[in-house]
Amino acid sequence: EDVGEDLAHEALCAAAWPGSPLGRPICGPRSSVAALTSADLLRYVREQYTPERMVVVAAGAFDKAALMDILERGLAALPRGAGRPAVDAPAFSPALTLRPKDFEQVCLELGWRGIPAGDERRYAMMLANFIIGGGASSRLFLRLREELGLAYSIYSGSYADTGAGLFTVSASVAP
């Protein structure tokens, strides 16, 4: 709530995906976080951190048979759980959201429907993101910040989830 860029991004996600888990604040509202107990956290870890939801990667010099044996024994010792639940793809909702706050800068975030995870077009989206606003050599940064001096910071982002994607342009400017 005290970081303008975070506040803008949470407001954008809430407006773009109303009623969807993707539209909820990452950390949750203070009331939910304050109500959590250690038992809640332990239950969450038991339910979510299971072999069915795990990705294991090995890179480097290793004996495949020995590693597989270690992994199979180690994973067999972990409690089982349900696989990842199916989630309906949320509908993207265009909106205008204003959140007045006493900050030294105005944090703007524009968002468009992006490319979901698993879509072949995601690679083109990643490249477009890099060119448009992916760093200090991007078109947005060079033109709007360096040449015109219109923004303190400016960048783009591409976020992909199952069935949904979001492309954003974020900027911090003078009021």
Feature locations, PLM:
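Charge-rich, well-structured scaffold segments of protease-associated domains
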Residues: 1-83, 98, 116, 124, ...
